[in-house]
Amino acid sequence: ACSGNGVIFDISDPYKPMRIDDVLDQKFAYWHSATFNNDGTKVLFTDEWGGGSRPRCRPSDPMDWGANAIYDIVDGKLEFRSYFKLPAPQSEQENCVAHNGSVVPVPGRDLFVQAWYQGGMSVIDFTDSANPTEIAYFDRGPVHEEKLILGGYWSTYWYDGKIYGTEIVRGLDVFELNVSDMMSENEIAAAAVADQGALFNPQQQFVVTWPKGDPSVALAFVDQLVRSEAMPQSDATEYAETVSAAAQELAENSKNRRVSNKLRSLASDLDTSDADAIAAMRMTELKTTLQDLARRIR
């Protein structure tokens, strides 16, 4: 994000970075930050309209001002997909605009936790980059009921299972995700085992990985497939029971060839031929995770 536009560079050779594409948007006032998804196939730009000091989330404000712009990266080029702005209108007394955030490492999903100054905090699902959705939020309300005092979340960052929100006036808030219709216990558990490296700097964005054959990762994929209606509940129950049996073997540091073979069989049953792109990706990742889990207990 370069204030007046968004630019993508090829940094394969860090000593000779090459500019390969750039985008302009007349609705963007100040291109403030850019965050890639973990696969590096998408980028989310934030527009800090007015430098973050003014109300820009009132009912009268356009939903594409002071918002995010989400682009897919296709053959090295940026292709616009959608805007996202927090859906809850704010008052004249609340400075509100898109600001700093970071990826929430749930496997199989592209999630971003974002600060909106006095607009609070949003967790955004942009797995479908053309249809981003808010799946969680927190909002303290205005610092003062009658006049605008600069405040709110400057940044919200995920680290080691928690979200840290730096509130300009009211200090540091620490959050955990709650189970909901849009976030399962298994997804939260899978995010907690993500490896972000020994040090975390959201501006560097090192690739996040998960332990091979981790039961919570497998169950997270199953939950996602059920939620998107790509897997019947009856099938999901069989997958969950088998993965849970494997998890018990791991907890007891034991082996079980029968459960291992069942995991391999379930992996081979996954058919992506009729699945959409997102479901197919999750099935493929689930298949790999089941095979890795099978090897761990064989």
Describe every region a protein language model picked out.
Residues 1-225:
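Feature marking well-ordered beta-strand scaffolds used for ligand recognition
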Residues 186-298:
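Soluble extracellular-acting proteins and domains
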